[in-house]
């Protein structure tokens, strides 16, 4: 039932049998006493966050069996990440990082408990692991709440109605957070919430105060002087207690916070790539307890299920951004969590005397030990992320714990070979409670008396493009659902009965007022499609329910991480009075009107057809089959499509169609000499970032589209660029905003070389290892200058 990890450099033996030679010279031995009688706090779990927001969006659109496989890797015990806590966003119709999630109550008196995908996700998690703990937290809220004031009586009722929706879905919510995520908290309202929960049958729901930005433990200070607030608060929490986007080497918490005696959580961590975040996670999960007595650790986010042009496109435990192909990739981050989650359970106890830093030195690594409260079972999790040599660990078990056989599981986090991740490497029978093992640098180990662990075997199909033509008439959806592949960026675009006498189902923007935002508030819009789409026309039937405007978007690419209104895109905007414009936006939100005019008024409650076409640098806007205007602009060569409205406009859309052919030639570029891929380091979207080699991982920063204009696009809006338009050997290959310049044009040749149109030089790396920089080079015929598209 267990898989053995090939090439794992662990030596584990009974002390009496002698020590097996390790693969590297060991440092001085570290002695660890596993004492079941040690004091320690109660473990609450390791989990992840779905929300903040839209990052799980495409998961629900996956076909079976891939959707079920992904869910198994996330939630099924003994299979993958085996999450113990799932925190979800209480949708607020507003963008909360990577998109907007719909509210269960768009306006006062409204209630629909089937909107969005978080209910479905919680149901799927519970079906696989009935013991998983569920947490609810709002990032933003509909504008009717308190007439724009977050902490209000309206908010109390809003929370209660959300819990009622959970009950309709057969879900019991374990925790609610009494704050607006990372924005604001209120001691008085927390007391109001606690009283309301008790009065309405939810006394078992625990209240979390905090979820604040790093270093902000304001609620902890407040409870020291406010008895009612203290009594209303079950958990104090904070975000990124080990540092934001950090290696998570230190996770300090003020002594005064620990001294409150309250349960402490590190309730959001990570924000890192689904593979590259594994080492920080390995450190942080142990060190939040060692340094700060925090008993829960949540990774943001759960899954990277959004398209590569959206902020944080590869952050999560699994990459799942292609429901049209079924492709997914389980990251090293998932296995880093599994080393704790598959060997413990909420309610276990930390053993403080059996936890610490190897040899008393942080650089050697850390270890924590937890025990079952009802049996003699225990698990010790050891990480050696920063160690420079092998270390011998001498362990001695005492204090009523099992002295029976222990099982060793290991992951080599220095390796990108999936075979080196989460393997069962040894079984040890202690002698008199004593045993030893040798821990190698850069590894994560679990030493346990438990059984039942496993590594999932489901495999992903190959990647594939979403090709043209594409269309959706929206018929066949249930009311209140999000149309397939359509991702809300602001507002709430959901299926509804069509108006003005039209039969069937349409998509309606249903948020009728400005929200209480989390990010900058902008007009509602939603996106769909392939960032490589280039030559196409997007068409949609539109109906304005009241005075305002609607819009079509095209060639939509990168988006600013802090402002969803700052996006590379073209727009056709038209109002009920007939005023229209073709506009260009960018990631600095510099909106340029390329052409404008006035057409026959659209009016309200009548259907019209809008079209926005792209052919090379020619952009054509049409209304009801008549051309409104044509412009020439080559700023953005490719991108997605979208629909949108003015703020508060509850417009309808039907018969969305994108006509054209192909989806662009999108693939990784695999170097023939190294088998590594052309990569934008750290998923950067910053102009001037030099590309390099990296192990192929399917991330959006490795997906290159060769356009008909000979550009190599990444993220749908950045072009591979010969820096400074230089034609000299040694010129850095970088990413830059697309300009249509010849220094951004490339020939993909039959012999596998890629040559610059302006320079004639070959694209080549400065080595074969990870991070080898890529430059223009004199062509030599070497395999190092040849690339395979796959």
Locations of regions flagged by a protein language model:
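C-terminal beta-sandwich/jelly-roll accessory domains of carbohydrate-active enzymes
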Residues: 383-492, 496, 500, 514-516, ...
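Short, solvent-exposed beta-strand-to-loop segments that form ligand-recognition rims
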Residues: 623-642
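N-terminal catalytic cores of secreted or lumenal carbohydrate-active enzymes
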Residues: 29-173, 178, 187, 191, ...
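Localized edge beta-strand/strand-to-loop motifs within extracellular or lumenal beta-rich domains
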Residues: 606-620
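Aromatic/acidic polysaccharide-binding cleft in carbohydrate-active enzymes
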Residues: 266-344, 348-362
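Secretory/extracellular carbohydrate-interaction modules
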Residues: 511-581
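Carbohydrate-binding surface patches
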Residues: 356-404
């Amino acid at each position: 039932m267990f898989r053995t990890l090939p090439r794992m450099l662990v030596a584990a033996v009974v002390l009496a049998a002698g020590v097996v030679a390790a693969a590297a010279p060991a440092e001085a031995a570290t002695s660890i006493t596993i004492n079941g009688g040690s004091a320690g706090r109660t473990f609450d779990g390791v989990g992840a966050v779905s929300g903040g927001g839209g990052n799980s969006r495409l998961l629900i659109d996956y076909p079976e069996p891939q959707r079920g496989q992904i869910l198994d890797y996330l939630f099924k015990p003994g299979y993958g990440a085996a999450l113990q806590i799932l925190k979800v966003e209480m949708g607020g119709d507003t963008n909360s990082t990577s998109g907007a999630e719909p509210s269960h109550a768009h306006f006062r008196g409204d209630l629909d408990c089937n909107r969005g995908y978080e209910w479905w996700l919680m149901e799927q998690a519970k079906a696989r692991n009935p013991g998983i703990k569920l947490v609810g937290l709002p990032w933003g809220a509909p504008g009717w709440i308190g007439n724009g004031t977050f902490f209000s009586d309206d908010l109390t009722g809003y929370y209660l109605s959300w819990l009622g929706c959970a009950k309709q879905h057969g879900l019991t919510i374990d925790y609610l957070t009494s704050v607006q995520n990372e924005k604001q908290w209120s001691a008085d309202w927390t007391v109001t919430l606690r009283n309301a929960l008790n009065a309405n049958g939810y006394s078992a729901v625990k209240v979390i105060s905090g979820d604040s930005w790093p270093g902000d433990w304001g609620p902890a200070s407040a409870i020291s002087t406010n008895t009612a607030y203290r009594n209303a608060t079950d958990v104090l929490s904070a975000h990124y207690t080990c540092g934001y986007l950090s290696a998570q080497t230190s996770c300090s918490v003020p002594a005064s916070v620990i001294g409150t005696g309250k349960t402490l959580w590190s309730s959001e961590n990570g924000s890192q790539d689904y593979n590259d975040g594994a080492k920080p996670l390995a450190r942080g999960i142990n060190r939040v307890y060692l340094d700060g007595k925090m008993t829960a650790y949540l990774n943001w986010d759960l899954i990277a299920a959004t398209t590569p042009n959206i902020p944080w496109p590869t952050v999560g435990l699994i990459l799942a951004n292609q429901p049209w192909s079924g492709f997914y990739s389980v990251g090293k981050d998932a296995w880093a969590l599994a080393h704790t989650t598959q060997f413990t359970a909420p309610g276990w106890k930390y053993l403080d005397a059996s936890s610490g830093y190897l040899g008393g030195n942080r650089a050697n690594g850390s270890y924590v030990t937890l025990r079952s409260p009802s049996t003699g079972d225990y698990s010790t999790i050891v990480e050696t992320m920063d160690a420079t040599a092998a270390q011998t660990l001498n362990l001695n078990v005492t204090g009523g714990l099992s002295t029976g056989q222990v099982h060793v599981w290991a992951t080599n986090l220095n390796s990108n070979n999936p075979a080196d991740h989460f393997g069962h490497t040894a079984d040890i029978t202690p002698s008199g409670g004593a045993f030893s093992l040798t821990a190698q640098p850069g590894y994560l180990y679990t030493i346990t008396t438990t059984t039942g662990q496993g590594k999932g075997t489901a495999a992903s199909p190959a990647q594939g493009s979403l090709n043209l033509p594409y269309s959706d008439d929206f018929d066949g959806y249930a009311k209140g659902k999000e149309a397939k592949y359509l991702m809300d960026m602001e507002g709430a675009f959901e299926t509804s009965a069509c108006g003005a006498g039209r039969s069937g189902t349409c998509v309606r923007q249903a948020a009728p007022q400005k929200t209480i935002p989390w990010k900058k508030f902008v007009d509602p819009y939603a996106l769909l499609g392939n960032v490589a789409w280039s030559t196409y026309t997007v068409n949609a039937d539109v109906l304005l329910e009241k005075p305002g405007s609607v819009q079509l978007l095209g060639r939509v690419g990168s988006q600013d991480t802090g402002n969803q209104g700052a996006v590379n895109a073209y727009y056709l905007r038209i109002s009920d009075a007939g005023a229209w414009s073709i506009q260009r936006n960018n990631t600095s939100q510099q909106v340029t009107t390329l052409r404008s005019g006035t057409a026959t008024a659209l009016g309200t409650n009548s259907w019209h057809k809008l079209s926005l076409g792209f052919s090379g640098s020619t952009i054509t806007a049409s209304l009801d089959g008549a051309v409104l205007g044509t412009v020439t602009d080559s700023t953005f060569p490719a991108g997605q499509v979208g629909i949108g409205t003015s703020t508060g406009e509850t417009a309808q859309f039907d018969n969305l169609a994108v006509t054209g052919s192909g989806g662009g030639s999108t693939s990784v570029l695999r170097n023939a000499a190294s088998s590594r891929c052309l990569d934008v380091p750290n998923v950067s979207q910053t102009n001037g970032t030099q590309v390099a080699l990296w192990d192929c991982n399917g991330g959006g920063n490795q997906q290159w589209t060769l356009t008909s204009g000979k550009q190599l696009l990444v993220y749908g809006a950045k072009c591979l660029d010969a820096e400074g338009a230089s034609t000299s050997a040694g010129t850095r290959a970088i990413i830059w905003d697309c300009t249509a310049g010849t220094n951004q044009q490339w020939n993909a040749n039959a012999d596998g070389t890629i040559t610059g149109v302006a320079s004639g030089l070959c694209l080549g790396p400065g080595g074969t290892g990870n991070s080898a920089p890529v430059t223009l080079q004199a062509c030599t015929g070497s395999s190092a200058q040849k690339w395979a598209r796959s």
